[in-house]
Amino acid sequence: MDRFLTYFQVRGERANAVRLFGEISEQIDCSHLKRDCFVNGICARQHFKECCNIATDNGSRTNADKLVALALRALLDRQTIWTCVIKNADYVSQYADEQMEEEVNKLYDVYLQSGTREEFEGFRQRNRPSRVVMDDSCSMLSYFYIPMNQGNPAPVAKLSRWGQFGICYYDRTNVDGLIPYDEIGLAQAIDGLKDLIEGRLPVCPYTGANGRINAVLHLPLEMEVIMAVQENATQLMRRAAQDFKFITHAGWRLYPRLLRQRFAIEDATEGVIHHVMLGHLRYYDEDTSIVKYRFLNDGSLDWRTWTIPLHLMRTARLGHLQPESILVFMHKSLHVRYALWLTSLCLTQSRWLIQKLPELTGGTDVLYTRAYVHADNHKVPNVRDLMMNEVFRKIDDHWVIQKCHTTKEAITVTAIQIQRSIRGDGQWDTPMFHQSMALLTRLIVYWLTDVTERSAIFRLTCFAIFGCKPTARGRYIDWDDLGTFMKNVLDGRDLTVLEDETCFISMMRMAMLHVQRSKVVCATVLEAPLEIQQVGQIVEVPFDFMHN
């Protein structure tokens, strides 16, 4: 194939099309209906490489142009191309690992020579690469609400801190209600708690941080055993920090966007959040609220079961779920998760509110996904399970499948997912590398791209594999801000023609090797829906949860 491209001076996108089509043409079943597939009496769709060799041997420019045009035209049918890639990967090479390592090394050479590594190292850096994967699937907002006892603040049983957050533990038997965190009449009492925690615990036992306490969380005593585990505390408190950012932006220009993104509340003031969190819900013939129910009921040893399920709250706000089902989920959170729970309620599609995607693509911010597989233990989703125009993304602890309508949308969705959970350290044969390739393979092979989009995919691939390697000074690039990350990935310079061809060859071969491997390394698809235990009659009554 290289001989054909060199002899006839085929470059750029035309060369990429010829290379890709040459890899899969043997898997095409051509009907020869229009007879335009024949070159010198041979079906070029089914025997593309052979026709290219004959054209090169004969020096036939006419046949060469016809073959290039045929390849470009064939690649417009991306679903057929994807099917042929799957069929072509049925044979698993015994040297697949060595071939993958070779292609990764070639890609690293382009990463260096194109100046992409130097460009990455020019971004902000930090000393440690540790991070927590964050999304808007769960929240600690309910623990900012203040426990009360007969009209006064409830007595505090224990004190702790995490970074700049004070933590107060309460005996549930001394709590008969909760009120908003911004209640003016209790501001002085909360400031007194901050001063008390600073005096008792000048240094954080978790992080070693000192200084002022910026906010106070109010937790039941039963959570002390959960917070005693460093990983649990880190996961919960990073989400608390996200919630505190939401609280402190009340009244700012960003606040309406945060309300819509996190709670599906549109065109509202800051006070409406209390209607959602404290609005009356009927459950087991009693009036309760999301905040009250979360505080008074236990989770399990999994830290997620102590949070509030933001996704279900958004689904209810969008009118696709009874609000009381949120409480049912929290009651059953020992055993089920979002995707399985929604499937059990006969909701074959989940609705997700995504704010960044419409900003970048101009599309809708309400997305529909279908459940795929739990993401426990670094399970790798199988690209063979994707259907037309679908890509993988991960919500909390399980993979879902989303349909995209344009190449840019697919790149954006994949970039958001990779930024959120993938950190490449240069080690190619790791679970995180295979997760990266499951996402990138679909972009590289399925979607029709131009040079700008391929350049973005190249930078995204380099980030996914090499993005967390330390610099020469032992520091790490800070990729945490999504807006900055998307700007750096999507808006970088276009690759030159030679760089484009070189990196496309390596990425295409890596993608095909991953598809081969996916025949062996498969994800475990969700089982049949669980039967949900009957929890009594749930009566729908007027309440303020849907208040705007």
From Swiss-Prot:
One Pfam family recorded for the sequence = Orbi_NS1
Q: Which domain of life is it from?
A: Viruses
Family to which this protein belongs: Belongs to the orbivirus non-structural protein NS1 family.
Protein known as: Non-structural protein NS1
Task: Name the species this protein comes from.
Answer: African horse sickness virus
